[in-house]
Amino acid sequence: MPSVMSDDVSIHYEVKGQGSPVLLLAGLAGVGASWGPQIDLFAGTHQVIVPDHRGTGASAHTARAMSIAQHARDMARVIEAVGCGPVHVVGSSTGGAIAQLLAIDHREQLRSATIVSSIARADAFYRRQFDMRRRMLADSGLRASAEANALFLFDPMFMREHPEQVQAWVDTVSAGIFEPEIGFARIDMIVGHDAFDDLPSITTPTLVLVGARDFCAPPYFSAELAERIPGAEFVILEGGHLIFLEKPALLHGTIEDFIARHEQ
């Protein structure tokens, strides 16, 4: 399995397909495979790089240096190891925060940035939400937490129409292994993320996307991102926080249209 050392931590990644490179950055769970159908959709026309964040998946399981800035450095090392830069980065939620730091601190590695369902910085709502999610994990365990999180992460209409897909997601998450030190460090990492003041320095062509019924990172967070990033495009689609699973073709098509305009 391919991996690269980043500040003494092994970062695993997978590469699939051929064409202009797309780096997919997962959300809080950190496991690249969580992108589900998006991997094959992008691999149809692109070289897709899908890393596991430090502390997750096949990367080294450590809570050391758990920050968004460190994750951006890790992803810059992955791009260098594959030798494919500059890339089109697509990041969802926590991955979107990492994409912001790549565009701020490693802009030479990017052709474009797509930030999905993310935040520039936490506010009282976001902190309260993750304080609750942290307590759920600590007090009730992984399955109860996954059952509750589904209410934040999926569009209610999608849950109404596709309850079996939501339950399959809950079962997959619940089958994982929860390592408290790493899990809580990752929650602290996204709640502590704050790129607000640095966003105006971004020169990378940027698309900001969000689901209209995202209850984890409501659309006002994405509107703030788009307002702060010079020239950013802002699109609201029908869906929830996990819109890449709910509306895979719609999300993929929207991002592909943007990427096609920024291939050079």
Task: Report the location of each language-model feature.
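Conserved HGGG/HGGXW glycine-rich cap/lid loop of the alpha/beta-hydrolase fold
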Residues: 7-61
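Active-site loop/oxyanion-hole signature of alpha/beta-hydrolase fold enzymes
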Residues: 49-90
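Flexible "cap/lid" loop of the alpha/beta hydrolase fold
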Residues: 100, 104, 111-140
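Conserved alpha/beta-hydrolase catalytic His-Asp/Glu region
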Residues: 124-126, 144-198
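Short beta-strand/loop motif that positions the catalytic acidic residue
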Residues: 202, 208-210
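Acidic catalytic loop of the alpha/beta-hydrolase fold
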Residues: 213-217
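Catalytic histidine neighborhood in serine/cysteine hydrolases
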Residues: 223-242
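Catalytic histidine-centered segment of alpha/beta-hydrolase-like enzymes
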Residues: 240-252
